[in-house]
């Protein structure tokens, strides 16, 4: 989860019930590019089964929606 630790920390600090990010905003938080698969496969954003999911799940959020056309995602506090 080391690569995704900045996202985890950002989400932990948030008091919002819902957070919408563009993929670019997430890349800015990470100070790193998302893998190409994040832009192509909805499954990359699944709530579990992948190391990146630990960053939002452990911070108390779940993915609510993913828009692969407009490159944005909504997290909801779980």
Q: What name fits each language-model region?
A:
Residues 1-2, 76:
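Generic cytosolic/nucleocytoplasmic N-terminal low-complexity/intrinsically disordered segments
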Residues 2-19:
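Positively charged, polyanion-binding regions of nucleic-acid-associated proteins
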Residues 4, 23, 49-50:
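Alpha-helix initiation and N-capping motif
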Residues 8, 24, 53:
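Short glycine-/small-residue-rich flexible loop motifs, especially phosphate/cofactor-binding loops
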Residues 15-35:
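Hydrophobic/aromatic-rich, well-ordered segments within soluble, folded domains that form packed cores
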Residues 30-78:
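Nucleic acid-binding interface residues in structured DNA/RNA-binding domains
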């Amino acid at each position: 989860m080391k690569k995704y630790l900045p996202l985890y920390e950002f989400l932990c600090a948030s008091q919002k019930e819902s957070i919408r990010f563009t993929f670019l905003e997430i890349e800015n938080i990470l100070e790193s590019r998302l893998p190409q698969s994040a832009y192509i496969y909805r499954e990359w954003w699944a709530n579990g089964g992948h190391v990146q999911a630990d960053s939002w799940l452990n911070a108390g959020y779940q993915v609510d929606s993913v828009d692969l056309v407009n490159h944005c995602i909504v997290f909801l506090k779980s």
